[in-house]
Amino acid sequence: MRYGEKEIKEFDVENMEIWPNDAKNDYIIKITLPEFMCCCPRSGYPDFATIYLEYMPDKFVVELKAIKLYINTFMYRNVSHEASINEIYNTLKDKLKPKWIKVVGDFNPRGNVHTVIECRSDMVVPK
């Protein structure tokens, strides 16, 4: 097993590295992860997406290698577009407890269908 595979397989989300946020100002962190992959729970075929993560930290920020490893743990999992983005959102919201957070998964088209999933802490339900 190569070292990258080992790091991904051994990654434990419970021990995701987070750092204290010592900044006194409010600011937004924007992270783009253009190589997201998970497997379709029905067919097992790979699904690819770009993940856009934005958040306004409160007391904590995520270490960038930790978010990369966490995102890469999805590559061998059979999980839907919706479930993967909701899981990423919930995990980061619970770990970081940010003032505001948004996670968007922009999935590559499959079978002429393009899907974008968005979770955000200020979601307003349309009437």
UniProtKB/Swiss-Prot annotation:
The active site is at C40 (thioimide intermediate), D47 (proton donor). It is an enzyme of class 1 (oxidoreductase). The keyword Membrane does not apply. Keywords: Cytoplasm, NADP, Oxidoreductase, Queuosine biosynthesis. Substrate binds at V62, E63, L64, H81, E82. It catalyses: 7-aminomethyl-7-carbaguanine + 2 NADP(+) = 7-cyano-7-deazaguanine + 2 NADPH + 3 H(+). It is found in: Cytoplasm. Pfam families: QueF (PF14489). Pathway: tRNA modification; tRNA-queuosine biosynthesis. GO terms for molecular function: preQ1 synthase activity. One of its GO terms (cellular component) is cytoplasm. GO terms for biological process: queuosine biosynthetic process; tRNA modification. Its EC number is 1.7.1.13. Belongs to the GTP cyclohydrolase I family. QueF type 1 subfamily. PANTHER family: NADPH-DEPENDENT 7-CYANO-7-DEAZAGUANINE REDUCTASE. Catalyzes the NADPH-dependent reduction of 7-cyano-7-deazaguanine (preQ0) to 7-aminomethyl-7-deazaguanine (preQ1). This is NADPH-dependent 7-cyano-7-deazaguanine reductase. The lineage of its organism: Bacteria, Pseudomonadati, Campylobacterota, Epsilonproteobacteria, Campylobacterales.
